[in-house]
Amino acid sequence: MTITLPEVRMTMPARPEGVAVVRQALAGMADAMDFDAAVVADMKMAVSEACTNVVVHAYDDSAGILEVDIRAEEEALTIVVRDHGTGIQPRPIRRDVPALGLGLPLIAALSDSFELRGSAGQGTEVRMTFAYSRGDDAADVRVDGRWNPEPN
């Protein structure tokens, strides 16, 4: 018997009202999969931050697209938020260094793993994973596909 794990794919205009749509879809899927309420709250906060970054930063004065994939895997739920906008120059995400923006460090702190990919003019992809059962270990943080040398 083959079990098909749920997957949700959304593509919408990168507008503020889309953030709530993504958050509700994620909450519904996570609740149906019996995630702990505290983990669902972390997921919703992290996905809100990632989507808000797209709405605020990805597109220079023009309409753009927000893409979100939510996929159940054997041991975790993976959420990918991407845009095709101005891009970001990835750099190590450090939780101990104050920065103007708190979104990416917050996503890294809330998720069990975090990966940031992007380049100038090519858009940005934020991938975060939430394990079904959580340990006490800090999140694995990758920047542009490589382990972050200074995740803490």
Can you name each region flagged by the protein language model?
Residues 65-75:
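Short beta-strand/loop element within the Bergerat-fold HATPase_c
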